[in-house]
Amino acid sequence: LAEHIGSEEARFVHQGMTSSDVLDTCLSIQLVRASDLLIKDIEQLLAALKRRALEHKMTVRIGRSHGIHAEPTTMGLTFARFYAEMDRNLKRMCVAKDEISTGALSGAVGTFANLDPAVEKYVCEKLGLTPEPISTQIIPRDRHAAFFATLGIIASSIENIATEIRHMQRTEVLEAEEFFSEGQKGSSAMPHKRNPVLTENLTGLARLIRMSVVPALENVTLWHERDISCLLYTSPSPRDK
């Protein structure tokens, strides 16, 4: 940006700000936009679960505890249980979005020594963010920890649904199975098989998402007003590029 506008004006581009003001506020925008996508996806999943719950309201199946036959239940009740869980996750995601929707342009160590708070307020309004009430040189990392913990819970709920389908699709049970498109191969060596590939992948992806929660929690503790230990986590990894 400085190179684009010319050498005379370039000295004003970064005036009063630190790199953290820019990077943290940009990260908030990214997470807010990601939240909007996730909220929309959860709403679509809720609609599908509700539809299946009503469709199979009277579809009887055997309930199990410890993996052993217990008492009769219905597929509708199973889908209703998943619906209730994802509805809680929708509320969690909305709360996490609100908590991460903050920006900070408070300068070195967060004192506004070289930047008017009115600038922070103006920029945050333009970006759809709320000024961080009390910042240091960074936006407090407990906000990010709560956000990624929420993603971990949602991933676990999706794995919960996927695991149920995987168990139901076993040959010995075969009470339900995931969608199998025309021409889809179950196995290169055993084409007669209909493997639960989608739900197995969801199970693996859930583990990956949960792995991001612990580093986010570790980042809550920083030295004084700022250190860069958190950048190892918040910066994109080569695998993300």
Residue ranges and their predicted role:
Residues 1-106, 112, 116-122, 131, ...:
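A helix-coil-helix interface module used to build multimeric assemblies
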